[in-house]
Amino acid sequence: MRVVYLNPLGQMGGAEMSLMDLLVSMRAAEPLWEFSLLLGEDGPLVERAQAAGVQVIVAPFPRALARLGDSGGGPVGALWSCLKASVGTIRYALTLRRVLGELRPDIVHTNGFKMHVLGAWAHPENASVIWHIRDYVSTRPLMKRLLRMHAQRCAAAIGNSNSVASDIQTVCGPQLPALCIYNAIDLERYSPSGEKTDLDSLAGLTPAPHGTVRIGLAATLAHWKGHAVFLRALARLPKDLACRAYVIGGPIYQTENSQRTLDQLRAMADELGIADKVGFTGYVADTAGAMRALDILVHASTQPEPFGRVIAEGMACGCAVICSAAGGAVELIAEGQDALAHPPGDEAALAGRMAELVRDPELRARLGRAGRITAERRFERSRLAEEVIPLYQRLSGHPAAQPEAGLANAIGR
């Protein structure tokens, strides 16, 4: 079988790490299948995919297409962005159609809203398109319209949580089958054992005193990831708590108005009077090492989280995790057993949870142990191929496909 994956970015965000987990899982399960990855930009994902034995093709997006999105500007801004991107988008779609024709895939597996639309338009007639949707569609006016328009050209959609799968059905209707396949992670890499990143050095801070409890927020700089809530919660902590905080991550998006800058966050910390309590590392390639350096990992998203990959990673690394209780994130944890939760955007509640964990090392240790057990049970990487392969076989008419165990059963899970 030939499978072509489409992804807009070459940089390593959470969606790209999840895509890599799928590629590795599929390659291990089906070594004789042909896997290709077409990207809209160059970046670290190229080398990682090639190392996994996947053919990589980089077909750079035109600048206007790369910057097209729902972030900021409202309906008028979105319309203007579409008009600016239209000519380049048509040319790109024609190029994509030619490349896909040469690759002759049985399955076109798309990632990212732009590639969902482009893949639906450009795929060969004998190939089935699967949208792997890792975000809510209903909150994006432009992409919602585009996906609804192209849904009839898509054979199935995968949501990375039940929350996302339900959202897909709401937007695209029952004619587009949508199933939930949770993301997975590399449990050998994301483990309590291994080297710890020197976060103080990366952030330009003097080493923290022995016994300091380290609290971190690891995320892209997207507005909704809750950096402002995290910083305001830190400012509420009692001054006598022996803790230091870290903002781990940097900007990765080209879409206009989609993210904060590190300078903006540093200025906010200064205004809150906590500049000496928090460090900013910028982009960190070894996220597992960064998480192992933390005692407490905070997930502070202010909007419902489609999945919350960082939650699974933190649990796998043995961190005591605090997560924002909305969307797919609440599907990942058992509150009070393997993680703590707080209402999205509630800085006072988040501060209370952080203070509770800073003061209680036994609770931190218990949550860390339980979180690792949950990660091993639910997020092991080989599960991805076990769930995706039957879908591929069903849609491509593969002889190994079992009608009664195919897409219909997957949707019913």
Regions found by a protein language model. Name each.
Residues 320-323:
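Short hydrophobic beta-strand element within catalytic cores of glycosyltransferases
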Residues 349, 356, 363-378, 384-390:
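A short, well-ordered alpha-helix in the C-terminal region of glycosyltransferases
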Residues 30-34, 209-215, 227, 231-279, ...:
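A conserved nucleotide-sugar
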Residues 335-336, 340-348, 356-362:
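Conserved acidic donor-binding segment of nucleotide-sugar-dependent glycosyltransferases
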Residues 88-92, 110-116, 133:
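Short His-centered aromatic/hydrophobic patch
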Residues 191-208, 265, 404:
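A short helix/loop element that forms part of the nucleotide-sugar donor recognition site in Leloir-type
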Residues 16-21, 222-236, 263, 348, ...:
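A conserved mid-protein helix/loop that constitutes part of the nucleotide-sugar donor-binding site
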Residues 163, 184:
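Carbohydrate-associated surface elements
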